[in-house]
Structures are given as structure tokens and as C-alpha cells.
Amino acid sequence: MNAHKTAQNMSQEALYDVVRAPLITEKATLLSERNQVVFKVAPSATKPQIKAAVEKLFNVKVTGVNTLVQKGKVKRVKGRPGRRSDIKKAYVQLAEGQSIDLTAKLG
């Protein structure tokens, strides 16, 4: 697959540009019991890139990736309306029996 070839050639910094940070929320904690992990990813990242980056960074087998773009909220900044940035989330399904310890790897 083409995404695997590009991930093998990517540097460690480039992989962290694709997968930026884990998202630790109540929903993400519940999903971790079903072998799913949630990451904040680059807005331009594709599903094959995300899959390849997670497999290489964490040495796990990924069976699926679902993504969504969470639109930024409108907030007031110094009395004027402003807007937070949009973020892209990736829900990564791991193979049976695999897990990622996010506190040890990224801490």
C-alpha cells in the first residue's frame, strides 16, 4: 500500500505532525475498553497516513480509522466575537489484544 511506503520513509517528526496528540475525554476512556484510541490529527491527514503513523509510532496493528472535523466554537475575545480553530479527530480501531499506553509513550 502506498501509505505504508510513505510512512516508512517519514521521519519521527513527520509522524508526530500527522498524529499530534491523544484526546483524553470521558468518551475516549469508554472507547479504550473496546480497543479504540482517539487522537488529534493534522487537518490535512488522510486515513491511510493516520493508520501508517499510528502503526509505526506505537508498534500496533490498526484495523480501522474513522475521522471527523470538530468545528470551533464562537467565543468572545475582548468583547468581540472570535472563533476557535477547527480540530480533526481520528478514532483508531486496534487489533484484538493490542493496546496503547498513552501515558508512558507521550509523557
From Swiss-Prot:
Signal peptide segment: none
GO terms, molecular function: rRNA binding; structural constituent of ribosome
GO biological process: translation
A single GO cellular-component term on record: ribonucleoprotein complex
Family annotation (Gene3D superfamilies): 3.30.70.330
Classification via Pfam families: Ribosomal_L23
Domain of life from the UniProt record: Bacteria
Key words, A-Z: Ribonucleoprotein, Ribosomal protein, RNA-binding, rRNA-binding
Family annotation (InterPro entries): Nucleotide-bd_a/b_plait_sf, Ribosomal_uL23-like, Ribosomal_uL23/eL15/eS24_sf
Family: Belongs to the universal ribosomal protein uL23 family.
Described purpose of this protein according to its UniProt entry: One of the early assembly proteins it binds 23S rRNA. One of the proteins that surrounds the polypeptide exit tunnel on the outside of the ribosome. Forms the main docking site for trigger factor binding to the ribosome.
Subunit note: Part of the 50S ribosomal subunit. Contacts protein L29, and trigger factor when it is bound to the ribosome.
Protein name: Large ribosomal subunit protein uL23
Lineage of source species: Bacteria, Pseudomonadati, Pseudomonadota, Alphaproteobacteria, Acetobacterales
Gene: rplW
